[in-house]
């Protein structure tokens, strides 16, 4: 009986450790991102790829801020306020998720992530 109780307690403890934390940013579809860009041109569209990737093609109006160079100062240079809506993308969606987390850590409150440009079905320049 003691062993069974210990096993149940251990299982409860382990399942409690695997609970995922909720995202602090919003994940949106690329269609929703495009609709927001069209409706609200003051949104900041942030490309977190490297310069050469950005130069090869980017979403019109996107501002380059490579993932590795995001700091409080560099973010403030391209995002006017902490409440300004920011939509983040990269090549495949990995770096954009990391960047969204960093921006939330820096105090940005309206961060959205919409994946990568490789699946972007709309215009690029």
Regions from the PLM with identified roles:
Residues 4, 17-36, 43, 52-84, ...:
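Rhodanese-like catalytic fold shared by cysteine-dependent sulfurtransferases
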Residues 49:
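Short strand-turn motif at the edge of the Rossmann-like AdoMet-binding core
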Residues 1-15:
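Sec-dependent bacterial lipoprotein signal peptides
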Residues 10-12, 39-42:
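Intrinsic disorder/low-structure terminal segments
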């Amino acid at each position: 009986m003691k062993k069974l109780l210990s096993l149940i307690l251990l299982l409860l403890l382990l399942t409690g450790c695997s609970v995922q934390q909720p995202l602090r940013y919003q994940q949106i579809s690329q269609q929703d991102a495009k609709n927001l860009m069209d409706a609200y041109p003051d949104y900041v569209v942030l490309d977190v790829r490297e310069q050469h990737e950005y130069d090869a093609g980017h979403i019109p109006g996107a501002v380059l801020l490579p993932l590795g160079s995001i700091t409080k100062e560099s973010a403030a240079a391209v995002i006017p306020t902490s409440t300004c809506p920011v939509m983040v993308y990269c090549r495949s969606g990995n770096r954009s998720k990391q960047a969204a987390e960093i921006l939330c850590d820096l105090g940005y409150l309206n961060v959205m992530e919409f994946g990568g440009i490789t699946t972007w079905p709309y215009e690029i320049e």
